[in-house]
């Protein structure tokens, strides 16, 4: 009983403290008195059912498992940290330094690439500006060329109305093969390629006249002597297309009908199949660049060694050591002759090259051929040719190496050579006398005004040197001593 009282007293005190306890008294079924007290749950508003309690327990278990997992993770981290501290701080610092160095290198590489891209972009902008400027300049040049072309077309039309009809009247005598080539139209591509920049030179300066009104040096007046002086070059015209960089132009020192001393022939020698020979009946037509006729050779020629003499064109056949005689009026080949042992196609050229192995020349005494052979070991060989049959009448072997000189020509039976094809201040450096068989050193100034003389020939009728200097057709006055 005292125990029950104490229990009751404790419950009362706890109930008073909790302020939610309730005490009630009642008889049970047997009539015994029972004391019953209740206390409110501090967390739950109502008593959970059995299923809810199980769910709560499962939630607690999951929380506990999660807590255990986190605790295990923390223990693992603590273990790793402990191992790292045991290994010493230096290794960790070194690893960090290495990683930091790698990152710095990558940053420097990225910065370098950025700078290079900026420079490339700047260069592109500059190139773009330069291209735009070039485009503008080319547009202006195109407009200027169009104006010049229009002016040239008008000039051609004017000349056709005035000066050129006589060229058509003579075409009846031309064979059919050449008649087709001789029909020039201002709109054709061939005609446009023949356009040239003209240098106005009075005809009186080209064909100097004596007081009687006739040109000097008529046939029978040999005027022979040794070369002592060469004047400044006089430019007659300039070829416009690339085919005119090298070439040969000539007049016949002994013209035959229907050609005159004014008739001029021109050949552009850039190319592999050189067959066209442009004929200009008048000196004015040559200066203006309007051919009166175009010959098409039956076989191609090679290099710049051709000459015209007594109505025939003499030239070296391409890829051979053969000299060909082509009669200009009949437009047929009259003779061919292989020069014995002569080098060709680059074996013994002049110093500028150009397959100038065989070079023909004309002087007061007739027709010559300049070449070399294996037997002569590259020295110049000079032979006199029969102009009809091309037989060698006489031959001289000199001691002048052909590849050491730029060009050669013959005056009054004397062979003269030029020291350089490109130097503005070249010289006539050697002379060989066929009369004595001796050579001598000279130092006569010779001007290569345009620095690429590919052809130099002597015209005994006009007493001038004709030359082709880097697209330009020029002449040189000369002075000969008295024999």
From Swiss-Prot:
Alphabetized InterPro entries for the sequence: Olfac-like_dom (IPR003112), Olfactomedin-like_domain (IPR050605)
Ranges of residues in domain Olfactomedin-like: 223-482
Glycosylation sites: 43
Cystine pairs: 224-412
Subcellular location: Secreted; Golgi apparatus; Cytoplasmic vesicle; Secreted, Extracellular space
Signal peptide location: 1-18
Task performed by this protein: Secreted glycoprotein regulating the activation of different signaling pathways in adjacent cells to control different processes including cell adhesion, cell-matrix adhesion, cytoskeleton organization and cell migration. Promotes substrate adhesion, spreading and formation of focal contacts. Negatively regulates cell-matrix adhesion and stress fiber assembly through Rho protein signal transduction. Modulates the organization of actin cytoskeleton by stimulating the formation of stress fibers through interactions with components of Wnt signaling pathways.
Name of this protein: Myocilin
């Amino acid at each position: 009983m005292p125990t029950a009282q104490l229990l009751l007293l404790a419950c009362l005190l706890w109930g008073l403290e909790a302020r939610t306890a309730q005490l009630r008294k009642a008889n049970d079924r047997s009539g015994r008195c029972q004391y019953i007290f209740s206390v409110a749950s501090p967390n739950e508003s109502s008593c959970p059912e059995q299923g809810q309690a199980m769910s709560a327990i499962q939630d607690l278990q999951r929380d506990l498992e999660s807590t255990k997992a986190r605790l295990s993770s923390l223990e693992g981290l603590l273990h790793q940290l402990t191992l790292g501290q045991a290994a010493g701080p230096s290794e960790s610092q070194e690893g960090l330094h290495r990683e930091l160095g790698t990152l710095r290198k990558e940053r420097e590489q990225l910065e370098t690439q950025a700078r290079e891209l900026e420079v490339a972009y700047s260069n592109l902008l500059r190139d773009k500006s330069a291209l735009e400027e070039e485009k503008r300049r080319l547009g202006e040049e195109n407009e200027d060329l169009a104006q010049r072309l229009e002016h040239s077309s008008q000039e051609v039309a004017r000349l056709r109305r005035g000066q050129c009809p006589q060229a058509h009247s003579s075409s009846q005598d031309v064979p059919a093969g050449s008649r087709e080539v001789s029909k020039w139209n201002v709109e054709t591509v061939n005609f446009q390629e023949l356009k040239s920049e003209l240098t106005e030179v009075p005809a009186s300066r080209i064909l100097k006249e004596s007081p009687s009104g006739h040109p000097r040096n008529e046939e029978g007046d040999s005027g022979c002597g040794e070369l002592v002086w060469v004047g400044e070059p006089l430019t007659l015209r300039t070829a416009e297309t690339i085919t005119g960089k090298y070439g040969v132009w000539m007049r016949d020192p002994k013209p035959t009908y229907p050609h005159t001393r004014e008739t001029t022939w021109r050949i552009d020698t850039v190319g592999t199949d050189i067959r066209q020979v442009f004929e200009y009946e008048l000196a004015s037509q040559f200066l203006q660049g309007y051919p009166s006729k175009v010959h098409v050779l039956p076989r191609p020629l090679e290099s710049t060694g051709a000459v015209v003499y007594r109505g025939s064109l003499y030239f070296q056949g391409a890829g051979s050591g053969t000299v060909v005689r082509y009669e200009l009026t009949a437009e047929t080949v009259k003779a061919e002759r292989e020069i014995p042992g002569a080098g060709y196609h680059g074996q013994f050229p002049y110093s500028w090259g150009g397959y100038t192995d065989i070079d023909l020349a004309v002087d007061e005494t007739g027709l010559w051929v300049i070449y070399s052979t294996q037997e002569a070991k590259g020295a110049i060989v000079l032979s006199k040719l029969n102009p009809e049959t091309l037989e060698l009448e006489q031959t001289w072997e000199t001691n002048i190496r052909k590849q050491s000189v730029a060009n050669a020509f013959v005056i009054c039976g004397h062979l003269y050579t030029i020291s350089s094809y490109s130097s503005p201040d070249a010289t006539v450096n050697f002379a060989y006398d066929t009369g004595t068989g001796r050579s001598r050193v000279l130092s006569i100034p010779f001007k290569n005004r345009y620095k690429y003389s590919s052809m130099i020939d002597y015209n005994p009728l006009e007493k001038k040197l004709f030359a082709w200097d880097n697209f330009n057709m020029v002449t040189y006055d000369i002075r000969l001593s008295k024999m």
